[in-house]
Swiss-Prot record:
EC number: 6.1.1.2
Record lineage: Eukaryota, Viridiplantae, Streptophyta, Embryophyta, Tracheophyta
Description of the deletion phenotype: Lethal. In heterozygous plants, aborted ovules.
GO BP field: post-embryonic development; reproductive structure development; tryptophanyl-tRNA aminoacylation
Name the record gives this protein: Tryptophan--tRNA ligase, chloroplastic/mitochondrial
């Protein structure tokens, strides 16, 4: 479906700097652990029907911090998405309030097949659930089912300097093929929509990869700018509660599995957009296909196997994959594999992948076979998201001076 990537990684990021980059760099140098627990809370959805602004309670220890993440509806999730993002998201469910979004609006900013978008959306949702996301703990929904995403994006666009968007490397890279003049406005404003996805739900944390920090930097800058332009005393004079309109989201950086590399190039990330399917393991690949891909994957001619050798990126990547899917410690893998040849290790890795992915594939088939069950989950997730987003939108419209509809 065009540019396939996980929204939790917030796409391809560059080293562009904004005015508060120094403070963010210090923040990112000490990333929040995925397993931490917290006592303060994010906003709740109570009272969202009223016309007044909604106050937040940041002191109760009984409400979890909120994490928002998502993925584009490619319909085909690969191992990099799973190990780098989804597997970690599953681990977040017990510690945080979690919202997982199928971001179909993002999928249409580049050419795509209209006949496949809907199916890809449900297939991706089914894969989310098959990977272990528990709807009793987390909300799963489709971005376009919650119109507030686009509403908030427009409000944010009005406060985002063009120069900030021009620095985003994603637009430069994605528009290169068609030429800047032929690229869509949607592609250019893509970062504002991603920021809306985060800020709409007053996210406390956003899962991002080590190499993908530019978007969370932009989201923080936009949140701070809007708070300055419309929050505080200005908002209070319009009848609001004053204070900040948005929380400033913080990055949540996975400590393992955050960067799974291509099977054909150990220096490039595993990606759906890579032209060769041989470069990735898809979660729904058959057993025979997994064996074949691992058998043919790029290796090297060094003796033995080892982690963390800059001259052996493929070796480090394959050992890291094996470590994660086998559930073993790094030291255990080093001891087990240090004297192995590639001919011995590759079947071991293929078997570990098959064993790890087989339950996911079986669960996926069960979910896809029950479309009404999936529809109900996505509808309930959207209801919860709308409830949360309504608080933010009501406050934003009030703070920006809009005349709001009165319901009779």
């Amino acid at each position: 479906m065009g540019h396939a990537t996980s929204l939790s990684h917030f796409l391809i990021l560059s080293s562009s700097r904004f005015s508060r980059l120094g403070s963010l760099t210090r923040l990112l140098s000490k990333p929040t652990s995925l397993s931490g627990s917290f006592s303060s809370i994010s906003v709740t959805g109570q009272g969202f029907r009223c016309c007044c602004s909604v106050a937040t309670d940041d002191t109760s220890p009984s409400v979890k911090k909120r994490v928002v993440s998502g993925v584009q509806p490619t319909g085909s999730v690969h191992l990099g998405n799973y190990l780098g993002a989804i597997k970690n998201w599953v681990a977040l469910q017990d510690t945080y309030e979690t919202l997982f979004i199928i971001v179909d609006h993002h999928a249409i900013t580049l050419p795509y097949d209209t006949r496949q978008l809907g199916k890809a959306t449900t297939d991706t949702a089914a894969l989310y659930l098959a990977c272990g996301i528990d709807v009793s703990k987390a909300s799963v929904f489709v971005q376009s089912h919650v119109p507030a995403h686009v509403e908030l994006m427009w409000l944010l666009c009005s406060s985002t300097p063009i120069g900030w968007l021009q620095k985003m490397i994603q637009f430069k890279e994605k528009s290169r093929k068609e030429g800047v003049e032929n690229a869509s406005v949607g592609l250019f404003t893509y970062p504002d929509l991603m920021t809306a996805d985060i800020l709409l739900y007053q996210s406390d944390f956003v899962p991002v990869g080590e190499d993908q920090k530019q978007h969370i930097e932009l989201a923080r800058e936009i949140a701070q700018r809007v708070n300055h332009l419309y929050g505080g005393k200005k908002w209070k004079k319009l009848g609001g509660r004053g204070g900040s309109l948005f929380k400033i989201p913080e990055p949540l950086i996975p400590q393992a599995g955050a960067r799974v590399m291509s099977l054909t190039d150990g220096l490039s990330k595993m990606s759906k957009s890579a032209p060769s399917d041989q470069s990735r393991i898809n979660l729904l690949d058959s057993k025979d296909l997994i064996v074949d891909k691992i058998k043919r994957c790029k290796t090297d001619s060094f003796a033995g196997l080892e982690f963390d050798n800059a001259e052996r990126p493929e070796c480090n990547n394959l050992l890291s994959i094996y470590q994660i899917v086998s559930g073993k410690k790094k030291e255990e893998v080093m001891e087990e594999c240090k004297d192995m040849s590639w001919g011995t290790f590759k079947p071991l890795l293929a078997d570990a992948l098959i064993e790890h992915l087989s339950p996911i594939q079986a669960r996926y088939q069960e979910i896809i076979a029950e479309p009404e069950y999936l529809d109900k989950i996505l509808s309930e997730g959207a209801d919860r998201a709308e409830e949360l987003g309504a608080v933010t939108m009501r406050n934003m419209y009030q703070a920006m001076g809009y005349y709001q509809r009165r319901r009779y």
